[in-house]
Regions:
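Sec-dependent signal peptide recognition
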Residues: 2-10
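Acidic/histidine-rich, surface-exposed loop or edge segments in extracytoplasmic proteins
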Residues: 29-42, 79-84
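Structural recognition of the beta-strand scaffold that forms the well-ordered cores
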Residues: 35-38, 76-79, 111-114, 154-155
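Hydrophobic h-region of N-terminal signal peptides that target proteins for export
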Residues: 11-19
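Soluble non-cytosolic domains of exported or imported proteins
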Residues: 41-52, 71, 92, 96
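Histidine-anchored nucleotide/phosphate-binding helix
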Residues: 48-68
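A cross-taxonomic marker for long C-terminal extensions/tails that follow the last structured domain
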Residues: 88-169
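Acidic helix-start/capping segments at beta-turn-to-alpha-helix junctions
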Residues: 68-87
Length: 169
């Protein structure tokens, strides 16, 4: 009897683990997005990684099974860190790939906003930026503005990848 009482919990654990099996894919019924991206980066080259966050949301919702038209999505990207140098016209050659990606999304309706206070700190005026950029008075006030209008706040976090997927799998 004692042996049975000791082995019963182990047996139940094994059965429950077997019964659970593999994970389950859930097709969440996402509505068209209303999102504001808060981009404040320590290094302007991190903009490439931050734009993957925009791409991830945009592509998920414009492809099957959702198939939303770009005009159904309401996406705003607010730049107010070192990355604002990437959208200064004089730096276009240096950040060409990032500028082209932002222009592509801007042409599809994504709004790209730059904090006017940050621009001033960097010595930029409105005329210094790419033609798809809108300069707003203040990034923090702008974030509050969009959130009060029902936009979800997304803050890209950029980490240095130290291990490959194969190393940690």
């Amino acid at each position: 009897m004692k042996t049975l009482l000791r082995t019963l919990p182990i047996l139940l654990l094994l059965i429950s683990a077997w019964a659970r099996g593999a994970g389950t894919f859930v097709q969440t019924p996402y509505p068209p997005a209303k999102a504001v991206f808060d981009v404040y980066l320590a290094d302007p080259h991190e903009i490439d990684s931050a734009l993957y966050w925009v791409r991830s949301l945009f592509n998920t919702l414009t492809q099957a099974p959702y198939n939303y038209a770009p005009e159904d999505l309401h996406i705003v990207v607010i730049l107010h860190g070192t990355e604002i140098v990437t959208v200064a016209q004089k730096n276009e050659t240096k950040y060409r790939e990032a500028v082209e990606r932002m222009r592509y999304y801007a042409d599809l309706g994504v709004k790209f906003l730059v904090c006017g206070q940050a621009a001033e700190d960097y010595g930029y005026s409105v005329r210094d930026f790419q033609n798809f950029i809108e300069v707003v008075p203040n990034a923090i006030a702008e974030l509050a503005h969009w959130q009060q209008r029902g936009y979800a706040l997304i803050t890209p976090r950029i980490y240095e990848k130290r291990l490959s997927i194969e190393q940690i799998r």
